[in-house]
A protein has these predicted regions:
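Positively charged, solvent-exposed patches that mediate nucleic-acid binding
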Residues: 1-106
């Protein structure tokens, strides 16, 4: 995922979380908000409660690869914040991918 398509600052994260729409399932929480740009942006969060930095970065890379596989299907001019839940840790890559995109396409 290119840097252009990433939500990075705490201010942007908080703005999307506080004033955007929230969608949930047992594996993910997705906050989304329309942006004024011509492309979608994604932010990924994995809580410190779920494991050490190596573990959290592994799951962030996993989610990033899921997004890269389907990025061309999205062009909604929307910012997304994807938060992994503890229940998602025990699921396979395919199950997580299916659940994530069911939330994003609602």
């Amino acid at each position: 995922m290119r840097k252009l398509y990433v939500v990075k600052t705490t201010r942007e994260f908080n703005d999307i979380i506080n004033s955007g729409v929230c969608r949930k399932n047992s594996y993910f929480v997705v906050h989304l908000k329309k942006n004024h740009l011509k492309y979608d942006r994604f932010g990924i969060s994995v809580s410190k409660k779920l494991g050490n930095a190596v573990f959290r970065n592994f799951y962030k890379r996993k989610i990033r690869s899921m997004i890269d596989n389907y990025k061309k299907d999205f062009n909604n001019q929307t910012d997304y914040i994807i938060i992994l839940r503890k229940a998602g840790l025990s699921k396979s890559h395919e199950e997580l991918e299916k659940e994530l995109f069911s939330l994003l396409k609602k």
